Amino acid sequence: MKKKAVILLSGGPDSTTVLEIVSKTDYEIYALSFNYHRRNSLEVQKIQGLIKDYNVKQHRVINIDLQSFIGSALTDDNIDVPKFQNTDQLPSDIPVTYVPARNTIFLSYALGVAEVIGARDIFIGVHTNDYTNYPDCRPEYIKSFEAMANLATRVGVNGEKITIHAPLINMTKEQIIKKGLELGVDYSKTISCYDPTEDGLSCGQCLSCIARLDAFKKNNVQDPIKYV
């Protein structure tokens, strides 16, 4: 009987690379995505086409309201998504695109799903470039959540260890794209943009777009998605 894995899938290149990695193993895959604001609704649409390329047992989209977490450009319509010209301009601290407790909320849902379906493995696509800007992407956070998961669940208390896997955690964005290209990831079906147009074009200037474009450039590969 195959082991089951829950994968947090955003529709971006990082989580898609994780999906590719896990798809080459013997896991039965349960993908979990979140629709939490109009600015990420395009991600959810992209995922519908993306997962057709993979043997995903089940894909769940969870609708949650994070708009009460004001102060983030990704959940508050009154805050503009900051734009940049190059990587030198990117913030070195926690940016306004940080969403309070986002990964904690997402991983908590994943943990609940894992218990229900009998999975003991949860995968998330955090990486080294996230550390500076997003504290809930750091290795110590992932380890702490895993420890909590094993203290606060029936399966954990019964001695069946739950593992939070972050296979990209020691990789840069450049290395992730390189790895994905080697594995055959179709990045044309992914999106990174924090502020896409209504017709699905990426802005090319938000933190996420700049980081993505830089990663493809360093791999001497043209980013296959369309920009404004």
From Swiss-Prot:
ATP binds at residues 9-19. Pathway: Purine metabolism; 7-cyano-7-deazaguanine biosynthesis. It catalyses: 7-carboxy-7-deazaguanine + NH4(+) + ATP = 7-cyano-7-deazaguanine + ADP + phosphate + H2O + H(+). Its EC number is 6.3.4.20. Its cofactor is Zn(2+). GO terms for molecular function: ATP binding; ligase activity, forming carbon-nitrogen bonds; zinc ion binding. Binds 1 zinc ion per subunit. It holds the Pfam family QueC. It comes from the Bacteria. The keyword Nucleotide-binding applies. Zn(2+) binds at residues 193, 203, 206, 209. Keywords: ATP-binding, Ligase, Metal-binding, Nucleotide-binding, Queuosine biosynthesis, Zinc. GO terms for biological process: queuosine biosynthetic process. Belongs to the QueC family. Catalyzes the ATP-dependent conversion of 7-carboxy-7-deazaguanine (CDG) to 7-cyano-7-deazaguanine (preQ(0)). PANTHER family: 7-CYANO-7-DEAZAGUANINE SYNTHASE. This is 7-cyano-7-deazaguanine synthase. It comes from Rickettsia conorii (strain ATCC VR-613 / Malish 7).
